[in-house]
Amino acid sequence: MLVGAGNTWLRLAHVALLAGVLTGCSEAAEGDDSKASARPTATAETSGPRDTAATSGGSIGAAGSACELPVTFDIAKSWTAEAVEAPLSQGPVSLACEIDAKPAGNIGFLRVWAGKSGDADTRAVLEAFLAAEDGVTKEKYRTFASGGVSGVEVEYLYSSELLDETKKESAFAVTTADGPVVVHLGGLDTEEHEEMLPAYELARRTLRTA
């Protein structure tokens, strides 16, 4: 088991994927400096404008769905979910499901991590999840409630040595009878992250225990 490998391995794979995507887009990007200059800068104090609420494309988590989880929630239209068998762990949780944004036109994943049952505090689980990865700063925690489930959410900055940039990321956690669940949203950069936030918010808003 790759205990503690967590997002480090995933980010390496992501960078390899992006290399091909960015190479294919390089010609279109030449001569269009206006787009590059318009890309938002990651800060801990401000958030970019949010798009309208995402349209549901179905739900996951229940028995027989693409990913069977301790919780259920809606995924955005055109996003695709796939159960993960690889034993990747980050802190107290292991990767259970990846929800891919590429079919919807974005580069990134909504990833679901699940842990073993116990009496762990929800915020402690989320703090341990972030502590298991280098480059995390400016964490801002808050509580939320959805469908009778209460949880903790965090927004933070992640500094990537691989991509030589700092970008926003988000995650929320809940504790169920079957163990803790962490739902994480990254993205290529802050712009991609902001564009995918409606899908993340849809998941949090429709969250229920399975």
List each model region and its residues:
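Signature of long, low-cysteine stretches enriched in small and polar/charged residues
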Residues: L126-V174
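C-terminal motif of bacterial Sec signal peptides marking the signal peptidase cleavage site
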Residues: V21-G24
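Bacterial signal peptide processing site
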Residues: S26-A29
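Surface-exposed amphipathic alpha-helical segments
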Residues: W79, V181-A210
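Bacterial N-terminal signal peptides that target proteins for export
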Residues: M1-A13
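Secretory pathway targeting signatures of secreted, lumenal, and periplasmic proteins
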Residues: A62-D121
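Short, hydrophobic/aromatic-rich segments at coil-to-beta transitions
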Residues: S56-A63, V93, G148-Y156
